[in-house]
């Protein structure tokens, strides 16, 4: 099957009739050699690029086209931004201007390298049990080779076994960087208690913080119970004059360079003086708004995130109230602005209560537009209307985008 890619799917695959083609862009002429069925869709397994689209550029990474991390790396950056606007409008019906990332290379502050018998790296696109072994990653860090080399040294000196998809000792190497502080956190995620402490601290002697996280299940994700092996409990990131503390058990926005744009977008949509920040995490929005003079209450179910948020407030000498608990149980009365930044699944039924009890001004932050629009159409639209929206490209070279939507009571 040969033809011209006419557009992209909502998840960023090139569209050729009924076939979806990864790493293909509008204007490309491709020949599909073989396909596979996945979740009711036909996806090209093997294809040839017959003629390049004028919006195509060479990938910067030598693993591009195999590694599943950067689907759009072969697309001019301004075209990436245009497509993200188009997809958002197609999914939500809302027109929103996108703000690009100040940096599109070496911008990620976290990377999870899977450690396997077949190498250390990332999963191949569409092949969850095939690993692309890497020694560089131009969207993460210029020091990737250093991190991979240190991990290999540690495995070699201890004789610990990498993951083989059924069992093994070490499963993931998670690395976090403070892009504006230069600090580094290493987190080895393993199926055994801390082992080879001396070898670990020597191999990663350059790190400011070294953790070992015990993984008690065999799910293929970088999660475990962390134990500090060496160095500082936290690393720091500096954003807009604020110090954010980062811990292995907590989430932090992955693009430190675009984060100020996201923070300013939320601030520009906030009204009044009293703000309720639900799903507040480590206080990303709460701390920034408090610095800007708002009276902020953050609610977060992850108690470790609450602990880190409180410590960050102390470090920054800010008066912010962080409450541990489910966002769904929070009291919504008495605030002029409500911020919600739910997980990818969205608000679901909680949006019904927000529609009934929420304040005049609602700010919905979402990395999953399809879930936002469900929440809006099912419940929020009965009480709120969309007043403004902006997109922030926190994820260059991928189809993903962060949306900030301002809603006002009807």
Curated annotation (Swiss-Prot):
Disulfide bonds: none annotated. InterPro entries: MeTrfase_TrmA_AS, MeTrfase_TrmA_CS, NA-bd_OB-fold, RUMT_ARLMC_TRAM_dom, SAM-dependent_MTases_sf, TehB-like_dom, U5_MeTrfase_fam. Its EC number is 2.1.1.189. Activated by magnesium ions. The active site is at 367 (nucleophile). One of its GO terms (biological process) is rRNA methylation. Keywords: 4Fe-4S, Iron, Iron-sulfur, Metal-binding, Methyltransferase, rRNA processing, S-adenosyl-L-methionine, Transferase. S-adenosyl-L-methionine binds at residues 253, 279, 300, 341. It holds the Pfam family TehB. It comes from the Archaea. PANTHER family: RNA M5U METHYLTRANSFERASE, TRNA (URACIL(54)-C(5))-METHYLTRANSFERASE. Catalyzes the formation of 5-methyl-uridine at position equivalent to 747 (m5U747) in 23S rRNA (m5U859 in the P.abyssi numbering). Belongs to the class I-like SAM-binding methyltransferase superfamily. RNA M5U methyltransferase family. This is 23S rRNA (uracil(747)-C(5))-methyltransferase. It comes from Pyrococcus abyssi (strain GE5 / Orsay).
């Amino acid at each position: 099957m040969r033809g011209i890619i006419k557009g992209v799917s909502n998840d960023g695959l090139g569209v050729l009739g009924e076939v979806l083609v990864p790493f293909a862009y509008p204007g490309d002429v491709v020949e599909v050699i073989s396909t596979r069925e996945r979740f009711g869709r036909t996806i090209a397994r093997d294809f040839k690029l017959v003629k390049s689209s004028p919006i195509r550029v060479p990938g910067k990474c030598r693993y591009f086209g195999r590694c599943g991390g950067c689907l759009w790396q072969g697309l001019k950056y301004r075209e990436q931004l245009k497509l993200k606007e188009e997809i958002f409008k197609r999914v939500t019906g809302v027109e929103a201007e996108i703000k690009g990332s100040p940096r599109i290379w070496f911008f990620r502050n976290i990377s999870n390298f899977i450690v396997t018998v077949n190498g250390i790296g990332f999963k191949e696109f569409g092949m969850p049990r095939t690993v692309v072994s890497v020694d560089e990653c131009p969207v993460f860090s210029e020091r990737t080779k250093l991190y991979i080399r240190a991990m290999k040294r540690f495995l070699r000196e201890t004789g610990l076994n990498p993951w083989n998809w059924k069992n093994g000792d070490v499963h993931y190497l998670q690395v976090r960087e403070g892009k504006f502080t230069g600090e580094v956190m290493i987190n080895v995620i393993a199926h055994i208690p801390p082992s080879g402490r001396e070898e670990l601290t020597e191999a990663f002697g350059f790190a400011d913080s070294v953790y070992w996280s015990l993984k008690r299940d065999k799910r293929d994700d970088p999660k475990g119970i962390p134990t500090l092996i060496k160095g500082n409990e936290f690393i720091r990131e500096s954003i807009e004059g604020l110090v954010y503390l980062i811990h292995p058990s907590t989430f932090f926005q992955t693009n430190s360079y675009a984060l100020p744009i996201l923070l300013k977008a939320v601030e520009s949509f906030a009204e009044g003086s009293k703000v309720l920040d639900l799903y507040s995490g480590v206080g990303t929005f709460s701390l920034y708004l408090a610095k800007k003079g708002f009276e902020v209450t953050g609610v977060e179910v992850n108690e470790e995130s609450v602990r880190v948020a409180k410590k960050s407030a102390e470090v920054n000498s800010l008066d912010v109230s962080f409450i541990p608990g489910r966002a769904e149980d929070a009291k919504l009365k008495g605030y002029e602005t409500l911020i919600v930044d739910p997980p990818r699944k969205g608000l679901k039924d909680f949006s019904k209560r927000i529609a009934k009890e929420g304040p005049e001004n609602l700010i919905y932050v979402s990395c999953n537009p399809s879930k936002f629009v469900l929440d809006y159409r099912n419940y929020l639209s009965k009480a709120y209307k969309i007043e403004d929206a902006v997109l922030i490209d926190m994820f260059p070279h991928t189809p993903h985008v962060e949306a900030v939507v301002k809603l006002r009571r009807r």
